[in-house]
Design a protein with these regions (language model features):
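Conserved active-site-adjacent core of cysteine acyl-enzyme catalytic domains
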Residues: 36-169
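Active-site-adjacent structural segments surrounding the nucleophilic cysteine of cysteine proteases
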Residues: 1-60
Length: 170
């Protein structure tokens, strides 16, 4: 799983959706960074800054600065599709992981703030996460260390044969 830190110096001060009142990638950009990590995992060349720029132009944020998850997939519509955005389900998480698809989950940090991380694997009963926030430098670590239940899921799937046309032309 590619590691992208939402507070990377290059983009941490960029406003979400180009609107300063929405906050910055560094402070509130965990959703954008998590989506960028999944897209990068699927071979799509992006980072939180590029995805934020795209979403800003594509009206990809609500008036409160929340990400329209389906519009993020418009970044590479021939490569990835938005599949699910709803309540948590361990069956859906496990099914996605068994098919090689990471899952974005919303958790609530001990401070009460919601945060998005990417479940990239499983070790026994522990889900292993890539955290675009403060835990970014840790690599994969157990979700349970955040001390939160999973509140919601978002996931994307790669579009099958995304490169078949390129291969056929060679």
């Amino acid at each position: 799983m590619p590691s992208l830190h939402q507070a990377e110096e290059k983009w941490r001060d960029d406003p979400l959706g180009g609107i300063e009142a929405n906050g910055t990638l560094g402070g509130e950009g965990c959703a954008v960074a998590a989506a960028a990590m999944v897209f990068k995992f699927y071979g799509i060349d992006t980072d939180p800054q590029q995805l934020n720029w795209f979403l800003t132009a594509a009206d990809g944020y609500t008036e409160n600065g929340w990400l329209y998850w389906d519009r993020a997939a418009w970044f590479a519509p021939d490569r990835v599709r938005h599949v699910y955005e709803d309540l948590p389900s361990y069956q859906l998480i496990d099914s996605n992981l068994s098919h090689g698809n990471p899952v974005i989950v919303r958790v609530r940090l001990r401070s009460g703030i919601t945060h998005f991380v990417v479940i990239a694997g499983k070790d026994g009963f522990d889900y292993l996460i890539a955290d675009p926030g403060a835990g970014a430098a840790r690599g994969l670590y157990p979700l349970r260390e955040l001390g939160s239940d999973i509140e919601a899921l978002r996931f994307y799937e790669p579009i099958a044969n995304a490169n078949s046309q390129v291969t056929a032309n060679r």
